[in-house]
UniProtKB/Swiss-Prot annotation:
Presence of the UniProt keyword Methyltransferase in the record: no
Segments of skewed composition (Basic residues): 10-24
Keywords: Ribonucleoprotein, Ribosomal protein
Family named by the database record: Belongs to the bacterial ribosomal protein bL34 family.
Name assigned to this protein: Large ribosomal subunit protein bL34
GO cellular component: ribonucleoprotein complex; ribosome
GO molecular-function term, one example from the UniProt record: structural constituent of ribosome
Organism lineage string: Bacteria, Bacillati, Cyanobacteriota, Cyanophyceae, Synechococcales
Alphabetical list of InterPro entries matching this protein: Ribosomal_bL34, Ribosomal_bL34_CS
GO biological process: translation
Gene that this polypeptide is encoded by: rpmH
Stretches the record annotates as Disordered: 1-24
Keyword Acyltransferase on entry: no
Length: 45
């Protein structure tokens, strides 16, 4: 059986796909908008 190799780093995840990072760019804001429209509980990480 293979091991799960993905550890996941909270800081890196926030820096790449956090809310404030999304709000910086036009396309990021579009992501937030579409997720709001869809009714997502979590808009960003």
């Amino acid at each position: 059986m293979t091991k799960r190799t993905f550890g996941g780093t909270s800081r890196k995840r926030k820096r790449v796909s956090g809310f404030r990072v999304r709000m910086r760019t036009h396309t990021g804001r579009r992501v937030i908008r579409s997720r709001r429209k869809r009714g997502r509980t979590r808009l960003a990480v």
